[in-house]
């Protein structure tokens, strides 16, 4: 059995850990609100831009001059998985859930005889994925030095992806990230971004309105598609940021509660042990006195 001194050290250590987790919870809570507002503000713009491009693409998809980002290469043999995760841990299942979804997709594609390449954004995703896919990882971007995410970060990632696509390195690109729903709910999401998936009109929506474009649809799309790619990546980064702080806040809250439970149990054991030792000493004193 541990000595009373060991028990006191253990209780003090648990209390110190509880203070750290409580502080991390408060920091995550303070950053969550700003991250949540940024993610929610980006959604309408990204969704509307996707809808506008889908509208234009509906008329241009079949034309011979359609941009390759829309029409694709005509094949789906080589798949690039753009996996966006966090730079830090201590956030529950935030990173592992995104990696799990990407890993399942990678294995499914490989079982179909497809070639898989992985582009990692975030240190945690890279560390987990390289255990199974070290040879498939073609690039890794870390954003640890970025104090606040900006559109320029997404543009840089989009430019690298487009450069690889133009070089013929892959046929299909799928973006993986975590969509923020609430503090306790983040949804791992996979979204195909190359070639662009044109949404079919909803049933019963009637014929789509006809527009005339100046310049032609192909020219508009050639300009908008790269920007839309950056917009979708930026949205994913913002969703990830909010999801990370939500998951971290929840994880640290659970850790703080668990530490409190441990402190109560350890204190109870300490008091019982101390009481037993005092009782034993009293019995020994009384027994000695009676013997005299």
Swiss-Prot record:
Using the UniProt record, give the first listed, main subcellular location. Answer: membrane
Q: How does it sit in the membrane?
A: Peripheral membrane protein
The cross-references to InterPro entries, in alphabetical order and at most eight, read:
ATP_synth_F1_ATPase_gsu, ATP_synth_F1_gsu, ATP_synth_F1_gsu_CS
Q: Which GO terms describe its molecular function?
A: ATP binding; proton-transporting ATP synthase activity, rotational mechanism
Q: Is Isomerase included in the keywords of this UniProt record?
A: no
Single GO cellular component term: proton-transporting ATP synthase complex
Record bears the keyword Ion transport:
yes
UniProt keyword terms in alphabetical order: ATP synthesis, Cell inner membrane, Cell membrane, CF(1), Hydrogen ion transport, Ion transport, Membrane, Transport
| Compartments where found | Cell inner membrane
Record GO biological process: proton motive force-driven plasma membrane ATP synthesis
Taxonomic superkingdom: Bacteria
Q: Which family does it belong to?
A: Belongs to the ATPase gamma chain family.
* Reported function: Produces ATP from ADP in the presence of a proton gradient across the membrane. The gamma chain is believed to be important in regulating ATPase activity and the flow of protons through the CF(0) complex.
Q: HAMAP family given for it?
A: ATP_synth_gamma_bact
Q: Spell out the PANTHER family in the cross-references.
A: ATP SYNTHASE GAMMA CHAIN, ATP SYNTHASE SUBUNIT GAMMA, MITOCHONDRIAL
Q: How does this polypeptide assemble, per the annotation? A: F-type ATPases have 2 components, CF(1) - the catalytic core - and CF(0) - the membrane proton channel. CF(1) has five subunits: alpha(3), beta(3), gamma(1), delta(1), epsilon(1). CF(0) has three main subunits: a, b and c.
Q: What is this protein called?
A: ATP synthase gamma chain
Organism of origin is Rhodopseudomonas palustris (strain BisA53)
Protein's gene: atpG
